[in-house]
Amino acid sequence: MSKYWSNITKDIEPYVCGEQPKNKKIIKLNTNENPYPPSPKVLQAIENAAKDDLRLYPDPNCDTLRKTIANYYNLSKEEVFIGNGSDEVLSLSFLTFFNPEETVVFSDISYSFYPVYANLYKLDYELAKLREDFSIDIEDFKNTKGGAIITNPNAPTGLYLSLDSIKQILEDNINKVVMVDEAYIDFGGESSVSLIKDYPNLLVIQTLSKSRSLAGMRIGFALGKKELIEGLNRIKNSFNSYTIDRISSLAAIEAIKDEEYFKECTLKVIKTRNWTINELGKIGFKIIPSKANFIFITHDTYQAEDILIKLRDENVLVRYFNKDRISNYLRVSIGSKEEMEIFMDKIKKIINKL
């Protein structure tokens, strides 16, 4: 710890990312990346942009990308905010809408960046305990003092919360912002975007990292009423006006436009997810129902951490969280069918030896 650090720097406990190995032979099922490449139209846009456009600053407002996303969701451009990945959008949203003296509510088992943001911005927060089956009790989000954030589908569980439940939470917090983090919504859930017209306190946050295969480009966005987006822009432009580079913006536009390719890839992930769930069930694993591109699994006989280590020895990475209530679970990203077949072969051999 350095004497030059501020008190905030000394006190903060940073988020820990999933491992990014250099070895290309490793099967990476630990960070919920898409196993399929971006649309060919995305790759062509990147090639074209790299020829001359890099000498110019990007559009600070990302107007063309905002229009593209707005058209896709039947919104206006003024109802779209673009950020450098959904993590930046989330961080700016915490700063824009939550006050230090008012308690924010989010689930005790959810995206572990939320408490990092809350601590960084000196926000009070309350952890709403999930039920035994990891479902949300919406009563825990009733009349919050400072607002709420819901991950839907939840991470790391993959459980989806119905739109009726989202509506109830919005109505119970009509004077506070409710954020719905929809990083994984495209793998089987129904988005809350349709509710924006009726709920001025709703902010929906999405990413192109998962379903559009652009994790390496860092494109996230928020959708909500104009006054919410104006607030986000005030904060963003107090940090950095140019958060999105030219190439990323052009790639994102083509990724949104190529609906056919998007549907093809997400359908393959969903089919492979269902196949993997079925195969794991045959060997005694319990799987939380998932609407994401990952599954959350446990076994009554074998310890999750032991399986984690053995899988790593076999060049297969999955995610383990050494936390209360979930320390005997593994989160497994859904890879290609071929990758998941290898995963199944490895895990069968491992549990036979444990």
Swiss-Prot record:
- State its Enzyme Commission number(s): 2.6.1.9
Q: In which pathway does it act?
A: Amino-acid biosynthesis; L-histidine biosynthesis; L-histidine from 5-phospho-alpha-D-ribose 1-diphosphate: step 7/9
In the record, N6-(pyridoxal phosphate)lysine modifications are located at: K210
Class of this enzyme: transferase
Q: Which Pfam families match?
A: Aminotran_1_2 (PF00155)
Q: Gene3D superfamilies, from UniProt?
A: Aspartate Aminotransferase, domain 1, Type I PLP-dependent aspartate aminotransferase-like (Major domain)
Which SUPFAM superfamilies would you find in this protein's record? PLP-dependent transferases
A GO MF term:
histidinol-phosphate transaminase activity
Cofactor(s) required for function per UniProt: pyridoxal 5'-phosphate
The reaction(s) annotated as catalysed by this protein in its Swiss-Prot or TrEMBL entry are: L-histidinol phosphate + 2-oxoglutarate = 3-(imidazol-4-yl)-2-oxopropyl phosphate + L-glutamate
Q: Which UniProt keywords apply?
A: Amino-acid biosynthesis, Aminotransferase, Histidine biosynthesis, Pyridoxal phosphate, Transferase
What GO terms describe the biological role, i.e. biological process, of this protein? L-histidine biosynthetic process
Query: Record's HAMAP family?
Result: HisC_aminotrans_2
Q: How does it assemble?
A: Homodimer.
Q: Which family does it belong to?
A: Belongs to the class-II pyridoxal-phosphate-dependent aminotransferase family. Histidinol-phosphate aminotransferase subfamily.
Name the NCBIfam families for this protein. Answer: hisC
What name appears for this protein in its UniProt entry? Answer: Histidinol-phosphate aminotransferase
Q: Species lineage, top-down?
A: Bacteria, Bacillati, Bacillota, Clostridia, Eubacteriales
- List the gene name: hisC
